[in-house]
């Protein structure tokens, strides 16, 4: 049960500190929709998505009205489509992508994920065909999101697929060049991808998640920043404790929404993702929290330390506030979506290399990084390989969402609008990793995988 005091505190956090719920995501299994006939699969899928998510928008609006708590996005996550379309032609796959996008528009769902594949080991011809369809699938849709998992701590890293994905990302950028290569913002490459992630572009409904469930993603960097502003001369352990307490309060709001949405939609409750997700608004930034902790400018020395502290405190505080936690759970550092990170890029203190170091202690990885459009595909592949190695060898989720903005060079401006914000094109290291990437093959799992 939630006390009246908790509800009053939540209302105050909304009014004063930009607290919101980033997403209510309905996860739906499509295994019982599968068919060798693409149109039959599409028809079955449509019926099932409408059955479970048809009332999602109305319920989210009802929650906003009842609790005064903004629900920024309504989303749907599907069983990875690659598991259901082995026999489909390239053209069939694009038809499926278009159908999913149309369903999302009809239900007024902001984003729909699950055009996904897991390729930890063998890169077979069916999966290669599916991944090759991703550029056209994203170029011909508006709300569809796609992801590929290329490595796990238990299985190792698939360099063959990483090599291919450099060219795939370049192709997405070219095919969506009229929108500053926006298609790349709807595609992410993972290591150790979670099955219950409510956040896009990496959300999909895992095979062990049941027929349907609801997962909630919280937000609230502004709440943490406001609390830290009152702790100007506090010791670092007091700072840690303050973050932990604020994370507890933010997560309680997420748990409240999860329980209410589950009851109204008559769908089992899944998890609350304990992630602090920034927005382009000033005052709603992870970078500003790091600077409030004591870093002069994000990207300067001490940034990784401050981020590690923040990430751990958020997890510890949030874990006490929710019945079930999961997803990515930590602090997000998407450059274009965080006004403070954008300032760091513009001032030169925040580099790609520093961001990579930060990903070793935070929730995701190199996220919403805009790089020059003429970057070689092998450089993108090597960027992915570096980040995947951090995830696989440290037994954590990492990801890469990089935008090689077509026709743009270092220092140019790119603006995606909305939650995705905008950023200057970042400087990259131009040394060639081509010889490394062209070796191909698989990297065996690390010794820490032998845990039984």
From Swiss-Prot:
Which SUPFAM superfamilies does the record match to this protein? PFL-like glycyl radical enzymes
Superkingdom of this protein's organism = Bacteria
The similarity comment for this entry is: Belongs to the UPF0210 family.
Outline the subunit composition.
Homodimer.
Instruction: List the HAMAP family hit by this protein, alphabetically.
Output: UPF0210
Query: What's the protein name?
Result: UPF0210 protein Athe_2116
């Amino acid at each position: 049960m939630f006390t009246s005091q908790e509800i009053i505190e939540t209302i105050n956090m909304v009014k004063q500190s930009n607290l919101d719920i980033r997403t209510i995501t309905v996860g739906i299994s499509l295994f019982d929709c599968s068919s060798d006939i693409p149109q039959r699969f599409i028809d079955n899928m449509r019926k099932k998505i409408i059955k479970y998510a048809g009332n999602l928008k109305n319920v989210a609006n009802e929650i906003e009205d009842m609790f005064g708590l903004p629900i920024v996005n309504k989303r749907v996550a599907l069983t990875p489509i690659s598991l259901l379309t082995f026999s489909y032609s390239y053209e069939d796959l694009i038809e499926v992508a278009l159908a999913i996008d149309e369903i999302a528009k009809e239900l007024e769902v902001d984003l729909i994920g699950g055009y996904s594949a897991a390729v930890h080991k063998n890169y077979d011809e069916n999966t290669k065909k599916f991944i090759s369809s991703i550029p056209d699938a994203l170029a011909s849709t508006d709300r569809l999101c796609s992801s590929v998992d290329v490595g796990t701590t238990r299985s190792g890293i698939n360099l063959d697929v990483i090599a291919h994905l450099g060219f795939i990302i370049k192709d997405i950028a070219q095919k969506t060049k009229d929108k500053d290569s926006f298609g790349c913002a709807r595609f992410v490459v993972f290591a150790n991808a979670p099955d219950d992630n409510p956040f896009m572009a990496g959300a999909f409904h895992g095979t062990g998640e049941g027929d349907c469930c609801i997962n909630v993603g919280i937000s609230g960097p502004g709440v943490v920043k406001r609390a830290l502003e009152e702790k100007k001369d506090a010791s670092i352990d007091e700072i840690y404790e303050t973050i932990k307490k604020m994370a507890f309060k933010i997560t309680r709001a997420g748990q409240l929404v999860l329980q209410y949405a589950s009851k109204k939609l008559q769908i089992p409750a899944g998890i609350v993702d304990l992630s602090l997700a920034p927005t382009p608004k000033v005052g709603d930034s992870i970078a500003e929290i790091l600077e409030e902790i004591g870093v002069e400018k994000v990207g300067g020395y001490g940034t990784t330390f401050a981020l590690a502290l923040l990430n751990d405190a958020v997890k510890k505080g949030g874990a006490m506030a929710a019945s079930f936690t999961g997803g990515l759970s930590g602090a997000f550092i998407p450059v274009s979506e965080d006004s403070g990170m954008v300032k760091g890029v513009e001032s030169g203190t925040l580099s790609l290399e520093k961001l990579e170091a930060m990903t070793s202690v935070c929730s995701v990885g190199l996220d919403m990084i805009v790089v020059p459009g003429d970057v070689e595909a092998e450089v993108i592949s090597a960027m992915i390989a570096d980040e995947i190695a951090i995830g696989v060898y440290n037994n954590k989720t990492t990801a890469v969402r990089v935008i090689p903005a077509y026709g743009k060079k270092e220092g140019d401006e790119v603006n995606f609008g909305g939650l995705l914000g905008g950023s200057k094109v970042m400087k990259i290291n131009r040394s060639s990793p081509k010889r490394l990437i062209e070796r191909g093959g698989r990297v065996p799992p690390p010794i820490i995988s032998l845990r039984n």
